[in-house]
């Protein structure tokens, strides 16, 4: 082994020193800060502490929301002996202790704000709230609530060909049959259902106005046997009074009622008779030659004389 080989292996070489850099401001010599342990590639960096954050995994852990669901019904109780303020203070204290154990870095107000924003954005927390809601609904309405929500096809009825309109010639008849079947299903269950308002079966005064009118022969028979007046199909009619003897007659000569034109004619005739009667009364007063107001004037003069006027 010669002298060159010894130099290549580093035997007898001088130890390395920090690189000295000439400072342009002071004019002195400064060491290079980027070199650590004589390694120019090493960088001096500080190790940061891990930042603890409030995440969905922390809220769904055993010390998170499951802890509240388990212990809140027992520890958060409202006492009638305490005031409303004391009861509310007792509830808030429970949640403050729970928040401090779960995430002690944040204050209670900041913890509530973080939980609110995280619950709106995280899908796992939304699913957890949905499961809690369904469990509560099952406790109130039974186990069938979840099965109905999970299998909505059980409640929906398949659409058949009879429910769809057809373009054939018999489409109207088929639609009418479907409507009739639907009406029968609806009316068939009215006896077992409870109505919000009681139905007055006896008060059928207005039902005669809306139901179909029987033929004229039956109307004539009813008018002859009773005092009730049926409503005809065409014109608006009124019962016959003593002042209006005219009316619409049936084929057998029975008077049913007067039409609208006959009513107007009867009113006009009555007005004419009244005017004629007044004219005749005035004519009788003129024939006697005595003014109707003269007797009253004479009585007034006699009364004034008695009083001394």
UniProtKB/Swiss-Prot annotation:
This is Chromosome segregation in meiosis protein 3. Residues 292-301 have a biased composition (Acidic residues). Keywords: Cell cycle, DNA damage, DNA repair, DNA replication inhibitor, Meiosis, Nucleus. Residues 141-254, 275-309 are annotated as: Disordered. It comes from Candida glabrata (strain ATCC 2001 / BCRC 20586 / JCM 3761 / NBRC 0622 / NRRL Y-65 / CBS 138) (Yeast). The keyword Cytoplasm does not apply. GO terms for molecular function: DNA binding. It is found in: Nucleus. One of its GO terms (biological process) is maintenance of DNA repeat elements. Pfam families: Swi3. Coiled coil: none annotated. Residues 150-165, 223-253 have a biased composition (Polar residues). Belongs to the CSM3 family. GO terms for cellular component: replication fork protection complex. Component of the fork protection complex (FPC) consisting of TOF1 and CSM3. Forms a fork protection complex (FPC) with TOF1 and which is required for chromosome segregation during meiosis and DNA damage repair. FPC coordinates leading and lagging strand synthesis and moves with the replication fork. FPC stabilizes replication forks in a configuration that is recognized by replication checkpoint sensors. The gene is CSM3. InterPro entries: Csm3 (IPR012923), TIPIN/Csm3/Swi3 (IPR040038). Residues 166-183 have a biased composition (Low complexity). Residues 278-289 have a biased composition (Basic and acidic residues).
């Amino acid at each position: 082994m010669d002298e060159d080989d010894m130099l290549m292996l580093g035997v007898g070489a001088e130890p390395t020193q920090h690189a000295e850099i000439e400072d342009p401001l002071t004019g002195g010599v400064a060491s290079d800060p980027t070199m650590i342990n004589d390694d120019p590639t090493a960088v001096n960096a500080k190790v940061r502490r891990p930042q603890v954050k409030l995440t969905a995994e922390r809220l769904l852990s055993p010390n998170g929301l499951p802890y509240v669901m388990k212990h809140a019904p027992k520890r958060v109780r409202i006492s009638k002996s305490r005031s409303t303020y004391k009861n509310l203070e007792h509830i808030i204290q429970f949640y403050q202790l729970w928040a401090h154990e779960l995430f002690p870095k944040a204050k209670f107000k900041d913890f509530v704000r973080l939980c609110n924003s995280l619950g709106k954005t995280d899908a796992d927390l939304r699913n957890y709230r949905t499961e809690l809601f369904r469990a509560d609904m099952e406790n109130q309405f039974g186990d069938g609530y979840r099965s109905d929500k999970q299998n909505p096809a059980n409640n929906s009825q398949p659409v058949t060909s009879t429910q769809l309109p057809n373009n054939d010639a018999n489409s109207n008849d088929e639609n009418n049959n479907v409507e009739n079947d639907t009406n029968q299903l609806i009316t068939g269950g009215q006896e077992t259902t409870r109505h919000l308002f009681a139905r007055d079966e006896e008060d059928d005064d207005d039902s005669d106005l809306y139901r179909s009118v029987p033929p004229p022969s039956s109307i004539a028979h009813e008018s002859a046997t009773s005092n009730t007046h049926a409503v005809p199909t065409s014109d608006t009619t009124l019962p016959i009074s003593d002042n209006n003897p005219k009316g619409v007659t049936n084929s057998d000569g029975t008077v049913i009622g007067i039409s609208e034109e006959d009513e107007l004619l009867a009113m006009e005739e009555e007005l004419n008779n009244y005017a004629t009667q007044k004219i005749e009364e005035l004519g009788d007063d003129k024939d006697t030659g005595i003014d109707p107001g003269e007797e009253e004037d004479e009585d007034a003069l006699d009364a004034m004389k008695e009083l001394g006027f």
